Amino acid sequence: MTTCWNHNTAYHPWILSAVAERPRARVLDVGCGDGLLLEKLTPYAGELVGLEPDTETARRASDRLAGLPHARVLTESFTDHIPEQPYDVIVFVASLHHMDLAPTLIKTRDLLSPDGELIVVGLSANRRLGDWLVSALQVVPARVLSLLHGETRDTGMTVAPPRESLAEIRATARALLPGAHIRRGLYYRYLLRWR
């Protein structure tokens, strides 16, 4: 398995442990990039579906997953995705901020099985003084850990700046996903889980 480390892959162990709690789960990775997370999830999931709207990136993910019969990549957006059946787990890693938040959370909620789970490693915009202070306090630890892990800075993925602040994300999630757990993470990320 070809692997790399960056501020997103740093949270792969957290995602793997959550999926491992649901043996043989049907998992959707939205904005799956080059398929690294899907590849790591193969021992834990019964079926893996990756969505990647960028044609070249989707090809790279499909190449990575070639020979894994229970994993596939679809070159389409989440908005256009119509699954055959609900998912047990839906994952967004640094992809939710590329989409309109409320409609995406509503669709996610609708695509989950009755006991399904949403897992997000997301980015939020700095809007308030507190946001900027937290980000400033993370600079040194994030840089030191990036050096220690040998961060791969450019993995060829599509990037976009976050649109909503963490307060806005919390308010939207509170309204649409009652009981969602949201917390700040390291590396300028937030973590969301909802069942």
Language model features by range: what are they?
Residues 6-25:
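Conserved alpha-helix/loop element of class I SAM-dependent methyltransferases that forms part
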Residues 34-36, 40-79:
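Class I SAM-dependent methyltransferase SAM/SAH-binding core
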Residues 91:
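A conserved beta-strand element that flanks and buttresses the S-adenosyl-L-methionine
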Residues 115-122:
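Conserved beta-strand signature within the Rossmann-like core of class I S-adenosyl-L-methionine
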Residues 80-84:
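Short conserved loop adjoining the S-adenosyl-L-methionine
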Residues 99-108:
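A short, conserved alpha-helix within the catalytic core of class I
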Residues 30:
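Conserved beta-strand/loop positions that form the S-adenosyl-L-methionine
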Residues 124-172:
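C-terminal alpha-helical "lid/dimerization" subdomain adjacent to the S-adenosyl-L-methionine
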